[in-house]
Amino acid sequence: MTSARMDVIGRLVLDDRVAAGRIVVEDGLIVSVDAEDGAGQESDEASRPYIAPGFVDVHTHGGGGHDVMDGAAGMDGTARHLIAHGVTSFLPTGVTAPLPDLVAFAEAYRASRPAVGPDVAEPLGFNLEGPFLSAWRKGAHDPTFLRDPADVALD
């Protein structure tokens, strides 16, 4: 079995500074991060890409014209939009809606799991922003769709 290795050279965004450096990836895993000390930096450093950890979006309803409530296509479109903006994982968030819509949202999330790859952000789970909200604190949520957590229809 051969090992896939890749050296990524660029400007590393570190805890305390940005430094020229290299990340070594083997079989899809980062095995080393080596920052240069600044001595002898090459003149083309400004043209090197920034290399930073991916962002995690813990509350998103979609992006790039896609809505996660719009089934598998909305979930996939959102995942592709987010990765293009540095978000590597996310929690799609459903809105307060009729129960069948929330079930469809959960099913779209489940269907999106196999689509994970380098060109899509990974959904880590999902949030239901509603329907279990207090009517006193509903904000912009449609009160028609608010539900009691003890609702037997969810079984």
Question: Whereabouts are the PLM-identified features?
Answer:
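Fold-independent oxyanion-binding glycine-rich loops
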Residues: I9-R11, D15-D16, S47, G54-V58, ...
